[in-house]
């Protein structure tokens, strides 16, 4: 009876401004409207000011001739190429130094991090001094130092240091060495290399499953390297083993022919790797220390050596702690590569900086830089998040 009385009681009407649902919708509409108005005002005001100053807008300039040289290119480029091509070349240079930096910094940082935990007092102290020295000095200063050392320590092209029967030359202009001339077989060698890498990955998975099932190890690393390198070698031999090379030769004041690793690239890569590896070393060390001490004791009790315990027991478990903060370091390598402009390496920022100076269209070019770095960073984050989920513990 009391329930019927409660259900039949008239509902109290609430004013619209006191209804939290209606109030929430109103606030959201007001905020979205204010943001939209602000965006419209900024865009319209910018377009009007650009028109008043007779500065073109839009991305049509990308189809015009660039008219400037780029010293280090991975693809064909000349001053007659378009601005779009020049920006593409700069992006490839950024990706090249970033990928190599991530790979080398991971290896070096892992070695330094493990070295800090070594029972060898001298090795542990050297690794600790390395970490403290590199991570407490700004990266830009390291880049200046490495570039100055490379440009001042080595002789000029006429006094270049020759090696390997004068086929390789080292000077303050870079490291010159011979490269194979273009041949159709190289395309098939590249395909064979990709197939070999895929086969090595499948072999590694099979070896791991076999060891889990039988306890018998399989030399998957050496076999994988043999497969990845053996397939391209077989393709090269089956294609007649073409060995025509372009050799570096001193002509005038510099070398021509072959290829060169420029000092700007070397200084940038060395700075990124040594600086970032100091942070990665601390991440690796903290990840290993986060494990229970009983893990290492159990590994030793099974008869494993210290190296085997680290490789087979400790590091695989520490990955769950190491991977999340490593994402930030990989992103830092990509973003810090923009400091290349300080030592003259033609990366994405340098190419777009020249484009801005010649076209005057700063807004569009800055948007291109932001879009490029955002795309690369999101791709790295997505991959690392996927890998982190893959190695996470799964509860039953």
Pin down the residues of each PLM region.
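Transmembrane alpha-helices and adjacent helix-loop boundaries
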Residues: 2-396
């Amino acid at each position: 009876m009391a329930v019927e009385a409660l259900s039949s009681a008239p509902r109290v009407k609430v004013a619209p401004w006191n209804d939290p649902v209606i109030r929430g919708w109103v606030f959201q509409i007001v905020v979205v409207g204010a943001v939209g108005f602000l965006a419209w005002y900024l865009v319209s005001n910018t377009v009007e000011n650009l028109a008043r100053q007779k500065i073109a807008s839009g991305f049509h300039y990308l189809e015009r001739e660039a008219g400037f040289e780029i010293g280090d290119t991975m693809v064909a480029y000349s001053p007659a190429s378009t601005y779009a091509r020049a920006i593409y070349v700069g992006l490839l240079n950024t990706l090249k130094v970033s990928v190599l930096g991530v790979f080398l910094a991971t290896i070096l940082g892992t070695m330094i991090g493990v070295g800090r935990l070594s029972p060898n007092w001298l090795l542990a102290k050297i690794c600790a001094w390395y970490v403290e020295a590199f991570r407490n000095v700004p990266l830009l200063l390291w880049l200046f130092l490495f570039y100055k050392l490379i440009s001042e320590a080595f002789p000029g092209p006429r006094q270049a240091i020759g090696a390997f029967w004068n086929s390789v030359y080292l000077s303050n202009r870079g490291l010159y060495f011979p490269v194979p001339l273009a041949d159709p077989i190289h395309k098939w060698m590249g395909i064979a290399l990709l197939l070999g890498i895929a086969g090595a990955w499948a072999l590694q998975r099979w070896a791991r499953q076999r060891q889990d099932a039988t306890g018998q190890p399989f030399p998957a690393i050496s076999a994988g390297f043999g497969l990845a390198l053996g397939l391209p070698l077989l393709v090269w031999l089956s294609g007649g083993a073409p060995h025509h090379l372009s050799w570096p030769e001193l002509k005038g004041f510099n070398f021509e022919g072959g290829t060169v690793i420029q000092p700007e690239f070397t200084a940038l890569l060395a700075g990124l790797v040594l600086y970032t590896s100091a942070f990665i070393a601390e991440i690796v060390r903290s990840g290993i220390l986060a494990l229970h001490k009983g893990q290492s004791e159990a590994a030793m009790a099974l008869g494993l050596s210290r190296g085997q315990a680290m490789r087979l027991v400790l590091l695989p478990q520490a990955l769950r702690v190491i991977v999340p903060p490593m994402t930030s370091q990989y992103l830092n390598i990509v973003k810090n590569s923009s400091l290349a402009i300080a030592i003259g390496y033609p990366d994405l920022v340098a190419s777009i900086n020249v484009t801005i100076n010649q076209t005057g269209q700063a807004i569009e070019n800055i948007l291109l830089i932001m879009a490029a770095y955002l795309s690369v960073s999101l791709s790295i984050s997505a991959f690392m998040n996927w890998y982190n989920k893959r190695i996470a513990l799964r509860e039953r």
